[in-house]
Amino acid sequence: MRTKINIEYRRLKGLFFILYSLFISMTLASCADMLEPESDLVEFEEDHTLNHATDSVYSVMGIINKMQIIADRVVLLGEVRGDLVQPTSAANSDLKHLSAFDFDGDNRYNQISDYYAVINNCNYFLAHIDTAMERRGRNLFMREYAAVKSYRAWTYLQLALNYGEVPLILNPLMTEREAREAMNQPRADIKTICETFINDLTPYVGVNLPEYGNVGNSNSEYLFIPMRALLGDLCLWAGRYQEAARWYHDFLTDKYDPVMMSRQKITWANSTQFNAIYNSYTPLKSTSEILCYIPMESRVFDGTISQLPNLFNSTTENNYFYELTSSASMAKISADQIYCFENDIPGATTKDTLYAPRTGLIRSELTGDLRYYSNYDLTSYGSKSDYSEYNSYRQQIDKIGAERIIIYRSTMVYLRYAEALNRAGYPQSAFAILKYGICDDILKQRVDPVELSLAGDLVSFDPELFRFDGSYFGIHSIGSGDSHANQYYTLPQPTEALPTRQDTVAYQIPLVEDMIITEMALEGAFEGYRFNDLMRVALRRNDPAYLADPVSRRKGEADPEATGLRQKLMDPKNWYLPLH
């Protein structure tokens, strides 16, 4: 899909006042100029009020235009700092420094002003849109107002995850003085950011998203962030797990627009010959899976194009020299899974359970979970000549595309719903999402009555919408076969009975959480989630090693740089980019 956002708002005087450019010229010792406006780049009317339908449409498109600039960093900052991706020898120095958490110098991926450009656009829109205007009994601009609030909250969450503590600015900055004063205020941490925007968004959760039809070649419904899912994320980061589970549940089970669990999977074609697979797994191309994305341009002339294909894949533009590749850690996580078959036995009422071999396969990526094989391919075209300017290896990561950067998709929301349920005290229900799928019939079979009673309608699914049938399966089955029958993939149990039920729940919660985080790696690899997933649990447990250990070992146990990197990452202050 090719997306073109260069709509004619570029020609309309007065509508680009919200495309307000900001830049950074700060050092570690001084940050007074971080938000200084570059007023020469825009033409605006300071007292202009947004009171025409075209104002709101073009202004929202302008905000998306600014979001395009930070879109690649959603993936890069989440993966290059994580353990599933590592830079190659061909990588640019900025990627190598990012991977090593070496932030002493300038880095093209550390441009905080780009985030504040989005935020200032949002702040201006929210301050000037006429939310009282009605026509024929319908509020004209409330949908855009709510959508822009979501853009702002999401952007601030990205800031907090990447920088740790940042200035929290909720009003538009129109002068250099205002920008300098904003920089002198106390900085807000992740929890403060989340609490602020939980309160900011909640009153508007019932407002429908704007309906613009097609914008270029994009269906505009995918351009807007689902507010309930975003509130779930904010509550999850804030440690408000019951509320997070509520928001995720209500989003997924909306009777007017329910979000079903994935029906896509990749499987071995049969259980006797392991030389062919059946693959319907295309999560970033399926309209049933995609919830929200940032569209990218197809030509530099039109605006911002994604550089991810040239960083992750072999292309003619990079002479096939990819700069980022799958790590040894990613391969190990995938290979550690056990692929299960459940076969019918002729004339019998029971089924036969088999497991895929772990050696002798035609490709090493086929060991364990098959999602890795589905997404990653590395092919050799012979040895490289000393005189050739082209790489003899070709890498293709199918999840990486130029058309859009996906920021919400259904399976990842289900996994965060599982994470919230588990931390809220419902590990059986959370585990059901991984192993069986989730609907009322499954929950009644797989979750004990005590937990079902305690969880109440947090795990209630309308049987008319979420109906159990033979195609229902848990998320782990997307790449690991018939997980419902897998005897090696089970709910953790203590070796001896514990004194109380609550003791057992407390024992299970961190272990189920580990399984969820592993599943997030298998399902969400190369999409930008990994570092933040590790960080969220490390902060929750007050255990920096939860992040430091896997990230430092991304290249394998024998990596000579692992010890120094682990020592650096044991201090959470080193996880974040500096504000310069």
Model regions and ranges:
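Surface-exposed intrinsically disordered loops and tails
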Residues: 190-193, 207-215, 259-280, 345-363, ...
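Conserved, well-structured interaction surfaces
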Residues: 57, 92-163, 184-195, 202-214, ...
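Sec-dependent bacterial lipoprotein signal peptides
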Residues: 2-29
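Membrane-proximal, proline-rich intrinsically disordered regions
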Residues: 31-78, 546, 553-580
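Long, intrinsically disordered, low-complexity segments
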Residues: 31, 291, 295, 302-307, ...
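Flexible, polar/acidic helix-loop-strand segments at domain edges
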Residues: 339-410, 432, 451-452
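Aromatic-residue-lined binding/catalytic grooves and analogous aromatic/hydrophobic interfacial grooves
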Residues: 32-34, 165-169, 194, 198-210, ...
